[in-house]
Amino acid sequence: MGHTQAKSTTDRRVEGGELLLQHLAGRMIPPEFSGPITTAGKFPTIQHVMDHIDSVEELRTLQAGGHWPEGTARRLGLDQPRPTPPPITWTEEEDKKAKEFFKQYQENRPKPAETAPPPITELHAAEPPQWKISPEDPLLKAKALIPVKEPEVPILKVPKLTNKKKMGATFGGILAGLIGLLVGFFLLTKILEILRKLDWWWISLSSPKEKMLCAFQNTGAQTSPHYVGSCPWGCPGFLWTYLRLFIIFLLLLLVAAGLLFLTENKSTIFEKLQWESVSALSSSIYSLLPSEPKSLVALTFGLFLIWTTSSSVTQVLVTLTQLATLSALFFKNSG
């Protein structure tokens, strides 16, 4: 394939002028005309003539403005309506003369007078006015021109309310009494249960399993066969059972009193029982306890609820937790 030469700007202008002339000529000649096309057309009407005059005026306007001169000349049959002027060239002598003239002009050019800038005067900040007023100033002693009247506020006397007995206080006292009775009955039941378990453990250590039946069940009133420690009402062993429970309760009180005595005196015997480990355990439990009394009551009540609805193993764990909590509270109050 051959390479086509790139069109110059002049050629592009010529083509643009021809396209413009064709567009203007299309306005003079109707599109259905199939005869030879000339500048004036064939068999022109008065409308064609007027369009031709308008087109020629537009061409003259474009030619006068210098737009597409070569394309306009080719369309109208003119060779060179405006010959291009020859390019201006400089000879070496003229170039040297121009450079020398410019050099002399720069040397002989008068220099602008250098004027020193005016000195800047130092501006000092004005001293702030003194707004202090002495106590003897007459402005302080002068009275206001407009008298100030205090607004009169009506005083409303509120009648005293008579102290009426509310039903809520009475109901609250009754409810508190019922809750106290419920808690006391619950504690009594749990204490008896713990004492019976200790009694059963004591009897199991002292007698074999074959002799666990009550020995008094055939001596008194006719009762069904039962074990020692669970004697019903009417059996002679009933009193002995509660006597043993009372003795166990006294022993527990004695042990508690001894512990209190040892903790108050901090004797050497209690120190041998690893006082530091016990105090560390109690302090760790105390750090986990809530500080508010309501939270402590809620915690204790929750432990009691777990006790009532759990198995024997869980009851043992809850009992140990309760004892640890009570001991921590005791050490807190004593410390």
Curated annotation (Swiss-Prot):
Q: Where in the cell is it found?
A: Virion membrane
Spell out the family assignment given in the record's similarity comment.
Belongs to the avihepadnavirus major surface antigen family.
* A GO BP entry: virion attachment to host cell
Q: Which residue ranges does the record annotate as region Pre-S?
A: 2-166
The root-end lineage is: Viruses, Riboviria, Pararnavirae, Artverviricota, Revtraviricetes
What does the UniProt keyword field contain? Fusion of virus membrane with host membrane, Glycoprotein, Host-virus interaction, Lipoprotein, Membrane, Myristate, Phosphoprotein, Transmembrane, Transmembrane helix, Viral attachment to host cell, Viral envelope protein, Viral penetration into host cytoplasm, Virion, Virus entry into host cell
Q: Which InterPro entries match?
A: HBV_HBSAG (IPR000349)
Q: So which residues are the signal peptide here?
A: none
Q: Which residues lie on this side of the membrane: Cytoplasmic?
A: 2-241, 189-241, 317-335
Site features described as Cleavage, chain residue numbers = 243-244
Extracellular-side segments: 2-167, 263-295
What does the UniProt record say this protein does? The large envelope protein exists in two topological conformations, one which is termed 'external' or Le-HBsAg and the other 'internal' or Li-HBsAg. In its external conformation the protein attaches the virus to cell receptors and thereby initiating infection. This interaction determines the species specificity and liver tropism. The large envelope protein probably also assumes fusion between virion and host membranes. In its internal conformation the protein plays a role in virion morphogenesis and mediates the contact with the nucleocapsid like a matrix protein.
- Glycosylation site positions: 265
> Where does this chain mainly localize?
virion
Transmembrane stretches, by residue range? Answer: 168-188, 242-262, 296-316
Q: How is it modified after translation?
A: Myristoylation contributes importantly to DHBV infectivity. It is most likely required for an early step of the life cycle involving the entry or uncoating of virus particles. Phosphorylated on pre-S domain for about 50% of L proteins, the L chains with internal pre-S region (Li-HBsAg).
Q: How does it assemble?
A: Large internal envelope protein interacts with capsid protein.
Q: Where is this region: Disordered?
A: 68-90
Tell me which residues bear the N-myristoyl glycine lipid modification: 2
| Gene Ontology CC | membrane; viral envelope; virion membrane
Q: What organism does the UniProt record list as the source?
A: Heron hepatitis B virus (HHBV)
- By what name is this protein known? Large envelope protein
Top-level lineage group: Viruses
Domain remarks in the entry?
The large envelope protein is synthesized with the pre-S region at the cytosolic side of the endoplasmic reticulum and, hence will be within the virion after budding. Therefore the pre-S region is not N-glycosylated. Later a post-translational translocation of N-terminal pre-S and TM1 domains occur in about 50% of proteins at the virion surface. These molecules change their topology by an unknown mechanism, resulting in exposure of pre-S region at virion surface.
